[in-house]
Regions:
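Short loop/turn motifs at secondary-structure junctions and domain boundaries
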Residues: 52-57, 136
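Hydrophobic alpha-helical elements and their junctions with loops/disorder across both membrane
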Residues: 20, 37-38, 52, 125
Length: 175
């Protein structure tokens, strides 16, 4: 499976993505807002990548390629919850928004799902802006929803309905 945007390719993960994905998941800057601490070993990332690959077509989850280099992931590890992470070297270019928009458009075009969801740390202002720019609406707050490396994190919950997504441009980079 492959989705192309103006700058990116979102595709199914492969075993040879291991080192590139490890570069993302082992970087403390990238995982600051992630649901687990940075990966310490390549084996830890291998287990994560194998689970991503085993998820199959019912859970469209993609690695993100920029100019032939894997720089992150975006998609739906658990339907209907969207998740995304990028290597810090490519932050600030609108790539996360472009990738998430493409993944969202794909799911609404190919799945019988009415609402997509997201869970974001209230301190992650960039991710909150991204979700809101894509039309996600805050639906709630949860205290101590994630235990990441022994530290409890809160969550803002977001949702995007199919009805609100109709008519939005597909896979365009944000302005």
């Amino acid at each position: 499976m492959e989705i192309r945007t103006p700058r990116l390719i979102l595709r199914t993960a492969r075993p040879d993505d291991l080192e590139a994905i490890h570069a993302v998941l082992s970087d403390p800057r990238a995982t600051r807002w992630w649901s687990s601490p940075p990966h310490d070993t390549l084996e830890q990332t291998r287990v994560w990548l194998e689970a991503m690959m085993a998820n199959g077509p019912d859970h469209p989850d993609f690695v993100i390629e920029l100019d032939g280099r894997v720089v992150g992931k975006a998609g739906f590890y658990e339907m209907p919850d969207v998740g995304y992470i990028l290597h810090p070297d490519v932050w600030g270019q609108g790539l996360a928004g472009e990738a998430v928009r493409a993944a969202v458009d794909h799911v609404f075009a190919t799945r019988d799902v009415d609402t997509l969801k997201a869970d974001v740390d209230p301190e992650n202002a960039a991710s909150i802006r991204l979700l809101e720019r894509l039309g996600f609406v805050r639906t709630g707050f949860g205290e101590r929803t994630w235990n990441v490396g022994g530290v409890w994190k809160d969550s803002f919950f977001y949702a995007l309905s199919r009805r609100d997504q109709v008519g939005k441009a597909s896979a365009e980079p944000p302005a």
